[in-house]
Design a protein with these regions (language model features):
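Bacterial N-terminal signal peptides that target proteins for export
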Residues: 1-12
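Hydrophobic alpha-helical segments of integral membrane proteins
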Residues: 16-17
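N-terminal signal peptide c-region/cleavage motif recognized by signal peptidases
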Residues: 20-22
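N-terminal, motif-rich segments that launch catalysis or mediate targeting to/interaction with membranes
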Residues: 24-149, 156-319
Length: 319
């Protein structure tokens, strides 16, 4: 895929990149692309069930749809709903798991706090989705959560942290866009690059359906292998964790040291990480984009195929 200097052609991507505290893995286009790829790999029975459940239990119109509601595709529309409700429902921790940089592979439960984490949230929502006696609206919400959280899980910065709120406190100059402080946050920041800027620049203006087709063709030879690997959610987290170390943080100039693992509620907490890193003038230009884009492409494609695997498995006995 060519990576010329084409800037963000979608309003969603532009807004998310410069929204100071955005933590919305993959942004609108990325999440919708994951859903559209998944849709291609659902069994006929699962696809029919998903479409029927979502159609019969539409999103409550009271919710402000950040990415905009769409009637083009029910799964694509469902993919971003969890970000619309996270503030009011106060379930932000469901979207990520903070495994500190430098951690050794092992059980993930110690990193899942009292408010939950993405792996636990997927497991809990699958229980609801599989329950044939559960209320249809509850099952539809569970489905929307699962569609979104599997996408979140494949954004590397939703699987790790460096005492920096998953990269939100890492100011980065992206091509000609210099990092600036906004209250207690920074933009562009490392998290926003991976949510929107990197995949949007890579997509070169393609809409989610076009991007899904491109990635589907690009990884056609790999998909069967991914499917044969089976469902291993914890392994997928560690994949993202390793990619965060080798590419997300590892390809930045200058390098960012591993920080002591301390709780950070804002970028100006006691560790003052945002201001310290701002003075390092961290940059991500063409070289970084060339390293990062293939990783983002593969994670979005894997996320779609694996989401289909989870739904096919869950709905096989739930209908």
């Amino acid at each position: 895929m060519k990576r010329f200097a084409v800037y963000w052609r979608s309003l969603c991507g532009l807004l998310l990149l410069f929204w100071p505290s955005a933590t919305l893995a993959w942004g609108c286009k990325g999440h919708q692309t994951v859903a559209l790829i998944a849709e291609k790999h659902l069994t006929a029975e699962a696809k029919q069930f998903v479409e029927k459940l979502l159609a019969e239990n539409p999103v409550d119109p009271k919710w402000n749809r950040y990415c905009g509601g769409t009637s083009r595709d029910l799964m694509a529309d469902a993919s971003t709903w969890a970000d619309d409700v996270r503030g009011e429902r106060k379930n932000g921790p469901w979207h990520y798991i903070d495994v500190p940089r430098g951690s050794q592979h092992g059980p993930l439960e110690p990193y899942c706090g009292p408010q939950g984490c993405v792996t636990r949230a997927i497991s809990e929502q699958l229980v609801i989705l599989k329950d044939g006696k559960a209320d249809g609206a509850k099952r539809a919400e569970a489905l929307r959560y699962i569609i979104h959280f599997v996408g979140d899980l494949h954004q590397p910065l939703h699987t790790t942290t460096n005492a920096d709120q998953g990269g939100n406190c890492v100011p980065v100059k992206y091509f000609r866009r210099s990092a600036r402080q906004h209250n207690r946050s920074y933009s562009p920041n490392l998290h926003s690059l991976w949510d929107t800027a990197i995949p949007d620049r890579d997509a070169e203006g393609a809409d989610p359906a076009e991007y899904a087709e491109t990635l589907e063709a690009q990884f056609a030879a790999d998909i069967e292998g991914w499917q044969k690997e089976g469902i291993h959610v914890d392994r997928w987290v560690w994949e993202g964790f390793d990619l965060a170390e080798s590419v997300v943080y590892g390809a930045l100039t200058p390098k960012i040291a591993v920080e002591p693992n301390v709780p950070v509620d804002s970028c100006s907490d006691d560790n003052n990480i945002g201001e310290r890193l701002l003075h390092q003038n961290i940059t991500a230009g063409e070289t970084y984009q060339d390293r990062a884009a293939p990783v983002a492409e593969k994670r979005i494609a894997e996320g779609g195929v694996r989401l289909a695997m989870i739904l096919n498995d869950a709905l096989r006995a739930a209908q």
